[in-house]
């Protein structure tokens, strides 16, 4: 007599592990990819297909990658991989930005030596070696993320040929007359000891001294006459307001708005000139309660009145400037031509003395003023205030917090300083307007990105592209010693230098003897020693690398740029401007910007706050696939939240996907697609339903991928695993899979559907869960490519004309009924009335339209609802204790314990349990299945 029926069941079996062990398995998979040169295999497989090219905005080669780097690279990798699924040849060439100050600072720190105390040739070589070390370190970290790319052939802005092509980009701008050299106030960083471009400035809150300072009139009588004052007064003073006391020493004029009304005001024994609209605010700051107006005139009447400088007693003119506004101050602005953009412009207009008493370290030069010489401008404000106070010129002082420009690298305040620099004239050849027009041809994701960059471009000044650095691409130009003009053959000369740099790198410029290039003219010229802004390096990569290296891009634009939202004024801006200036068109078809990573409270990652989470820590605790899934699950178009709790929720999502995959694989252990597959029209209704559901999900997932909405991809996959599969289909098929005759049509029908589902699911997750999809791929039966990354979307099984026994509307009703039965089952379990749902029989009381449809399915409904018996009765015959459905009108459900006995094999309760010599306590259905008598099913 048989009592143990385990060996008669088709129990699930797979070597695909339940526990992921990502930390171990991912490293093995990475080794496999490396050993077999997976990237080359993919390229060979996709050769000849339509190309998709994502241009990698180069990260800076300095330090470990942070969570923002991880987000960026993972998003790019997801895109490359999903494009491959769509049949594109999508190469990925990673890049690095390798020049500039941060590397110089790290090298100085490493060798414990100041840059000016070491041979610059040796220093550049050390910078190059340091940058290469950083590239190799970051490369390993990016590869650990599961990012597949041409890691053996990345582009580096310090590659000799790239350095030469960056210089050629500069040459082309000179050729097209976009560049000029001039003295102009630009943001200067004391720590960098260099000029900064607009994109290198952050505006942060700074504490400053807000002061009112007086300038005494040189000719009181002349002023009284202008204001038509009959009384005679001396001590007439113009009041100016400023938040930069350190600039007072460089003052060379005071300005008024020609269209404002200015008042002559008597305050005690003193007479002040103040703008009418700002009188009350100014007197309040000066703590003056009583005043008398002696006269009023428009500002234009005050032109070329002279006033005494409050410190050095030189005479400075009052000039006219329409930029003086009503927003703050006294309506009179002090002008230090070398230390402000507007000051410089108005200073040039009135031919003011461009006095520059401050050096590159932000210190006052010797001979500036007694007590100030050698002091730092930001640290000596109290000295300036005391000097003004001693001269009876300081009338108010208050500490204010206001927005002020800071160096994006050092987080230190900058100051405007007029120096000789190289500028990109973005208004030449109508470039600004043309760029705004061209920007509208790019598809921006999110859409508001277009307006953001147009606003930035509309208001930006000319681009200062020169830097006073050692490690960078040189501005390889010769300047005439006398007239300061560039050599007339500059374009040809730069090409000569570029060819030398192509062989020896940027050091070639500093090694070149002038006579090598200039012949007999060499004595008349001097080399420019400035380097190019690193944003010029990276911004020119469309031309310097892609067009030069990828000939196919000569006619075709890059498909996509993808970077953080800070790159609207950075890489996006520089790339677009340079591309339009040189090629006449935009560099790419689409630009996608992602947000910053913040903690669960919305705060940015900061070491000082202590909320930094590094990619390395996440990978070491959870694995790279969890990090990738977190990125994909986030709506990255705004700021992205991360915390331990969020990552644990991501682990739950991963577990759901993995468990679903494992269940599917475990039910395919005896399935050979070539011999066991069933045609769609012969499949059971629920298997047809599963395929239709899979098709519908695939359409949604493909659309979400194409729209770059990866969080919607994840939510669709989770809903599919949890709702379509987990809470409905997979539970229902267990009885059929485990208890039916192994080669029955009903069982093979299910396996055919399962194979289709896992074939689709593994591709859905491949761009996101690259390691897990690689692992799953090995266990799917049937002939296939060696790697999931070589595959494309599963061709959907057409289901439009399927002859299904169950209509769409009936499926919706069945799912609603099942959900309500599940709730009843849970209640009965909580009340300890049952241990298993199979102990129940269900009676459905339905109105005629539902009754007629359900009655056809009656014999198999118990399999759908996971109970032992289901009966269908008319609604009017319902019992009082029947549960009234909340989701279906005129339907009641009665759940009762079934009187039958439990089958030891299928665990269903039935009245046909057999007890004989051969079989003990099992049902006739199971006996038939054991003996190969095929169980007939249509629906479930």
UniProtKB/Swiss-Prot annotation:
Short sequence motif named 'KMSKS' region, residue ranges: 604-608
Subcellular location: Cytoplasm
Annotated residues for binding of Zn(2+): 903, 906, 923, 926
Motif ('HIGH' region): 59-69
Database matches in PROSITE patterns: AA_TRNA_LIGASE_I
Catalysed reactions, semicolon-separated: tRNA(Ile) + L-isoleucine + ATP = L-isoleucyl-tRNA(Ile) + AMP + diphosphate
Cofactor list: Zn(2+)
Ranges in a coiled coil: none
Family matches, as SUPFAM superfamilies: Anticodon-binding domain of a subclass of class I aminoacyl-tRNA synthetases, Nucleotidylyl transferase, ValRS/IleRS/LeuRS editing domain
Residues that coordinate or bind L-isoleucyl-5'-AMP: 563
EC nos: 6.1.1.5
Keywords tagged on the record: Aminoacyl-tRNA synthetase, ATP-binding, Cytoplasm, Ligase, Metal-binding, Nucleotide-binding, Protein biosynthesis, Zinc
Enzyme class of the recorded protein, top EC level: ligase
Family label: Belongs to the class-I aminoacyl-tRNA synthetase family. IleS type 1 subfamily.
Function as written in the Swiss-Prot or TrEMBL entry: Catalyzes the attachment of isoleucine to tRNA(Ile). As IleRS can inadvertently accommodate and process structurally similar amino acids such as valine, to avoid such errors it has two additional distinct tRNA(Ile)-dependent editing activities. One activity is designated as 'pretransfer' editing and involves the hydrolysis of activated Val-AMP. The other activity is designated 'posttransfer' editing and involves deacylation of mischarged Val-tRNA(Ile).
HAMAP family: Ile_tRNA_synth_type1
PANTHER family, A to Z: ISOLEUCINE--TRNA LIGASE, MITOCHONDRIAL, SOLEUCYL-TRNA SYNTHETASE
Assembly and binders: Monomer.
Domain notes: IleRS has two distinct active sites: one for aminoacylation and one for editing. The misactivated valine is translocated from the active site to the editing site, which sterically excludes the correctly activated isoleucine. The single editing site contains two valyl binding pockets, one specific for each substrate (Val-AMP or Val-tRNA(Ile)).
UniProt-recorded name of the protein: Isoleucine--tRNA ligase
Organism in which the protein naturally occurs: Wigglesworthia glossinidia brevipalpis
């Amino acid at each position: 007599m048989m009592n143990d029926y385990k060996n008669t069941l088709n129990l699930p079996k797979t070597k695909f592990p339940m526990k992921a062990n990502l930390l171990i398995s991912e490293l093995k998979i990475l080794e496999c990819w490396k050993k077999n040169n997976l990237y080359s295999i993919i390229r060979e497989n996709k050769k000849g297909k339509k190309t998709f090219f994502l241009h990698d905005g180069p990260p800076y080669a300095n330090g470990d990658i942070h969570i923002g780097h991880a987000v960026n690279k993972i998003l790019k990798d997801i895109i490359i991989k999903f494009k491959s699924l769509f049949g594109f040849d999508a190469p990925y060439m990673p890049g690095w930005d390798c020049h500039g100050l941060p590397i110089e600072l790290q090298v100085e720190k490493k060798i414990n030596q100041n840059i000016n105390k070491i041979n610059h040739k040796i220093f550049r070589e050390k910078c190059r070696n340091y940058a290469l070390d950083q590239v190799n370190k970051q490369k390993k970290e990016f590869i650990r993320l599961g990012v597949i790319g041409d890691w053996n052939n990345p582009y580096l802005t310090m590659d000799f040929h790239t350095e030469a092509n960056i210089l050629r980009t500069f040459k082309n701008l000179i050729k097209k007359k976009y560049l000029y050299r001039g003295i102009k106030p630009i943001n200067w960083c004391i720590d960098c000891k260099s000029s900064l471009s607009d994109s290198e400035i952050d505006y942060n809150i700074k504490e400053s001294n807000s002061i009112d300072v007086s300038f005494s009139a040189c000719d009181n009588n002349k002023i009284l006459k202008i204001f038509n004052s009959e009384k005679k007064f001396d001590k007439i003073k113009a009041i100016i307001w400023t938040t930069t006391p350190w600039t007072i020493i460089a003052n060379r004029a005071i300005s008024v708005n020609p269209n404002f009304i200015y008042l002559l005001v008597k305050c005690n024994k003193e007479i002040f000139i103040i703008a009418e609209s700002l009188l009350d605010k100014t007197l309040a700051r000066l703590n003056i309660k009583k005043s008398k107006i002696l006269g009023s005139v428009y500002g234009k009447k005050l032109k070329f009145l002279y006033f005494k400088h409050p410190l050095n007693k030189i005479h400075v003119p009052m000039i006219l400037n329409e930029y003086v506004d009503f927003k703050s101050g006294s309506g009179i602005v002090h002008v230090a031509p070398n230390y402000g953009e507007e000051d410089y412009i108005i200073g040039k207009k009135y031919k003011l003395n461009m006095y520059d008493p401050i050096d590159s370290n932000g210190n006052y030069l010797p001979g500036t003023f007694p007590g100030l010489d050698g002091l730092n401008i930001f640290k000596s404000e109290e000295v300036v205030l005391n000097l003004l106070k001693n001269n009876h010129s300081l009338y108010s002082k208050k500490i204010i917090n206001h927005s002020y420009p800071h160096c994006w690298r050092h987080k230190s305040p900058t100051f405007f300083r007029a120096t000789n620099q190289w500028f990109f004239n973005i208004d030449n050849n109508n470039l600004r307007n043309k760029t705004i027009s061209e920007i509208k041809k790019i598809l921006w994701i999110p859409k508001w990105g277009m307006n953001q960059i147009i606003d930035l471009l509309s208001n930006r000044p000319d681009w200062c592209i020169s830097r006073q650095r050692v490690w960078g691409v040189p501005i390889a130009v010769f300047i005439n010693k006398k007239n300061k003009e560039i050599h007339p053959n500059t374009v040809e000369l730069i090409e000569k230098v570029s060819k030398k740099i192509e062989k020896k790198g940027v050091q070639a410029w500093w090694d070149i003897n002038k006579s090598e290039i200039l012949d007999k003219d060499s004595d008349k010229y001097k080399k420019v020693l400035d380097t190019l802004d690193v944003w010029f390096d990276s911004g020119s990569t469309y031309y310097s690398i892609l067009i030069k290296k990828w000939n196919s891009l000569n006619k075709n634009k890059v498909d996509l740029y993808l970077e953080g939202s800070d790159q609207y004024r950075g890489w996006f801006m520089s790339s677009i401007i340079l591309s339009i200036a040189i090629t006449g068109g935009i560099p790419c078809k689409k630009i996608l910007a992602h947000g910053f990573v913040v903690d669960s409270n919305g705060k940015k990652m900061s070491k000082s706050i202590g909320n930094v989470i590094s990619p390395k820590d996440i990978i070491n605790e959870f694995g790279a696939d969890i990090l990738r899934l977190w990125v994909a699950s986030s709506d990255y178009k705004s700021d992205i939240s991360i915390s331990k709790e969020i990552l644990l929720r991501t682990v739950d999502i991963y577990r759901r996907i993995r468990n679903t995959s494992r269940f599917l694989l475990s039910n395919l252990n005896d399935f050979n697609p070539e011999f066991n597959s069933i045609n769609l029209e012969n499949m059971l209704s629920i298997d047809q339903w599963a395929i239709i559901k899979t098709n519908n999900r695939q359409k949604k997932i493909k659309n979400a991928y194409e729209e770059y909405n990866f969080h919607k991809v994840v939510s669709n996959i989770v809903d599919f695993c949890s709702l379509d599969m987990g809470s409905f289909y997979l539970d229902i098929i267990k009885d059929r899979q485990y208890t039916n005759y192994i080669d029955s049509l009903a069982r093979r029908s299910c396996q055919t559907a399962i194979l289709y589902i896992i074939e689709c699911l593994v591709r859905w997750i491949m761009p996101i869960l690259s390691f897990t999809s690689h692992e799953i791929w090995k266990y799917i039966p049937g002939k296939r490519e060696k790697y999931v990354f070589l595959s494309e979307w599963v061709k959907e099984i057409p289901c439009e004309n399927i002859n299904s026994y169950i209509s769409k509307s009936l499926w919706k009703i069945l799912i609603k009924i099942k959900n309500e039965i599940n709730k009843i089952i849970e209640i009965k379990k909580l009340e300890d009335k049952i241990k298993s749902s199979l102990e129940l029989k269900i009676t459905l009381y339905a109105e005629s339209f539902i009754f007629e449809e359900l009655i056809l399915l009656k014999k198999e409904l118990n399999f759908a609802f996971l109970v032992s018996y289901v009966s269908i009765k008319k609604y009017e015959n319902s019992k009082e204790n029947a549960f009234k459905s909340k989701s279906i009108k005129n339907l009641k459900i009665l759940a009762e314990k079934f009187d039958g006995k439990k089958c030891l094999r299928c665990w269903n309760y039935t009245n046909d349990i057999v007890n004989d010599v051969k079989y003990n306590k099992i049902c006739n259905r199971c006996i038939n299945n054991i003996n190969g008598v095929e169980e007939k099913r249509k629906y479930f």
